[in-house]
């Protein structure tokens, strides 16, 4: 689904205050939506998408993986609690093996 497809689906369900994560590489990590309109992102997919971007930029696999985890932890996960005042903050789903 494209971002616009997701927006259209959200609007059809009456959710106009759902917050998307800004990084476009995270759009492929959207795995669903809660009953009350929170987008659900898969953490492993978020990491893998950033690793792909970083390796294309020249980092080796280990550096890219470490950088991706650090970036998501610092710039995304830390920010989620502050998003609540702007709308329905995203939820990050973790695999059991993470």
Regions from the language model: what does each represent?
Residues 1-98:
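C-terminal alpha-helical interaction appendages
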